[in-house]
Amino acid sequence: LLLHDHGAHFSIGKEKMVRPFGVEASVLADADDWAEKCYDKQYVGDYLASHGYVVLAVDALFWGERGRKEGVRYDSQQALAANMLQMGMSWGALIAWDDIRSAEFLASLPMVHKEKIGTMGFSMGAHRAWMVSAATDVVKAGAAVCWMNTTDSLMTLTNNQNKGGSAYSMIIPGIRNWMDYPHVASIACPKPMLFINGLRDKLFPVKGVESAFSTMQDVWKSQSVENLLTTKFYDLPHFCSKEIQDDILEFFNQNLK
């Protein structure tokens, strides 16, 4: 289950993970440009599929074919979030719920081994990956690239999480009363999990990442499965390189095949 990023780029969603086919030239060009910008010119879905994995990628609400009929507009994120909150829902929670259902659908397919479902995402997709890994046992292993931190490290004047807009897609109201991001991710224990962040990632302060990694390491260690949690830094900005994708393939080969 491949979960696409946010990137404030809404014209495509699933096409960020799997190279589109049977689409207009403009959509293909859009996807290719994004793959170059964020994924080192390599589609993660195509890469994993070439190594024998069944891949499913679905648009999150507000992206691609689930976007605004009126056209892409950044500020409409807050309108969507506000309307959902007034109906007793939240955008971030709906995305998480959709990802759970996507995992269940993937597991139901006849060509898929339902006991070997993995998930991966970059940026917002990473947030989605550890959320769905924590939320359902349908998912057996998860890889998250460039989205892990602690609230205190993200609560700064310049961090995107405090500017509204895009942040609403990754906020579930009330959850911070009980636990922080690494605690939520730790609900996935004792599953195999891979967390990767960049030392030059301006969105996620290294100090906060280190603290979050330490919290998760303590949880996996408490269950005597510390060997199933891998936390790594790359000397990279907010980026999912081919080398990182090689790590992800190796991780899935070790834990799902």
Identify the role of each PLM range.
Residues 4-97, 107-108, 154-156:
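Cap/lid segment of the alpha/beta-hydrolase catalytic domain
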Residues 83-86, 94, 101, 141-185, ...:
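Mobile cap/lid helix-loop segments that gate and shape the active-site cleft of serine hydrolases
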Residues 111-123:
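Alpha/beta-hydrolase fold nucleophile elbow
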Residues 121-133:
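Glycine-rich nucleophile elbow surrounding the catalytic serine of serine-hydrolase chemistry
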Residues 134-140:
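Conserved hydrolase catalytic core segment
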Residues 188, 195-197:
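Short beta-strand/loop motif that positions the catalytic acidic residue
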Residues 200-204, 208, 238-239:
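Acidic catalytic loop of the alpha/beta-hydrolase fold
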Residues 214-257:
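C-terminal catalytic histidine-bearing segment of alpha/beta-hydrolase fold enzymes
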